[in-house]
A protein has these predicted regions:
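Amphipathic, interaction-prone secondary-structure segments
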Residues: 34-65
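Non-cytosolic coordination micro-motifs
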Residues: 69-144
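Hydrophobic beta-strand residues in large extracellular and virion-surface proteins
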Residues: 28, 50-52, 60-62, 79-81, ...
Length: 144
């Protein structure tokens, strides 16, 4: 079962793009009774998003930009996930989990991220190093 998360949900780790769906986000929201967040995304125009949780507990952020659909050939939302989940199960099984949850097939996928567990782990390490250095620098400033 798939459930909607609050609009203020945030991933615990770094975000990574998993795939792009070839079905409109409004259709998915209507099918599952979810509410979309509509907003202006700085520099990218009008967007619609929703956070959902899969039965496994993994969270997704689906975002669709009107400009991308109207002018760039985008067919549906980008699916972003916590990189730690890709590192755990890899891209292809994760895409399959998303498709099963939304009752979609591979024909409903426009693009799959060309990454693997190792790349996700590298991104997680980079992300963790950045925050450790930032926090360390912040603590040094406070000690002066």
């Amino acid at each position: 079962m798939i459930t909607q998360l609050p609009d203020d949900f945030r991933f615990g780790g770094p975000e990574m793009q998993l795939c792009t769906l070839a079905i409109r986000i409004a259709d998915l929201a209507e099918r599952f009774g979810f509410t979309l967040i509509h907003y202006d995304d700085d520099g990218l125009g009008r967007a619609a998003s929703m956070f959902v949780r899969l039965e496994s507990g993994r969270a997704l952020l689906l975002t669709e930009h009107a400009h991308a659909v109207e002018h760039l050939g985008s067919k549906g939302p980008v699916v972003e996930v916590d990189a730690r989940d890709i590192a755990e199960i890899d891209v292809e099984p994760f895409v399959d989990e998303v498709l099963e949850a939304f009752q979609l097939s591979r024909a409903d996928v426009d693009w799959i991220a060309p990454i693997d567990k190792a790349r996700a782990l590298d991104w997680i390490r980079h992300w963790a190093d950045y925050f450790a250095k930032r926090d360390q620098a912040g603590n040094a400033e406070r000690l002066k």
